[in-house]
Curated annotation (Swiss-Prot):
Part of the 30S ribosomal subunit. It comes from the Bacteria. The gene is rpsJ. Keywords: Ribonucleoprotein, Ribosomal protein. The keyword Phosphoprotein does not apply. GO terms for cellular component: ribonucleoprotein complex; ribosome. GO terms for biological process: translation. InterPro entries: Ribosomal_uS10 (IPR001848), Ribosomal_uS10_CS (IPR018268), Ribosomal_uS10_dom (IPR027486), Ribosomal_uS10_dom_sf (IPR036838). Involved in the binding of tRNA to the ribosomes. SUPFAM superfamilies: Ribosomal protein S10. The keyword Ribonucleoprotein applies. GO terms for molecular function: structural constituent of ribosome; tRNA binding. Belongs to the universal ribosomal protein uS10 family. This is Small ribosomal subunit protein uS10.
Amino acid sequence: MNGQNIRIRLKAFDHRVLDASTREIVSTAKRTGASVRGPVPLPTRIEKFTVNRSPHVDKKSREQFEMRTHKRLLDIVDPTPQTVDALMKLDLAAGVDVEIKL
């Protein structure tokens, strides 16, 4: 697989789970002989929801909730066939969304 890169984009709500999964992917890729660029932290997407505290009156009393989506980007440069096999068999934590582009 000369001259080819694998781009992996990870998303999760919990940054600790995301960083652990990133470390696992990096160690697997390095162990099989590929070089890794990253992890690059991408901007965190923050969604805020504002709702009334009471169900009926008191419009001024509100509560805000937010949902943060953390993202990381990894590039695996010149992957070997062993790297691809190891990444396919890798079992990541629940709650981590993985997008892979060749």
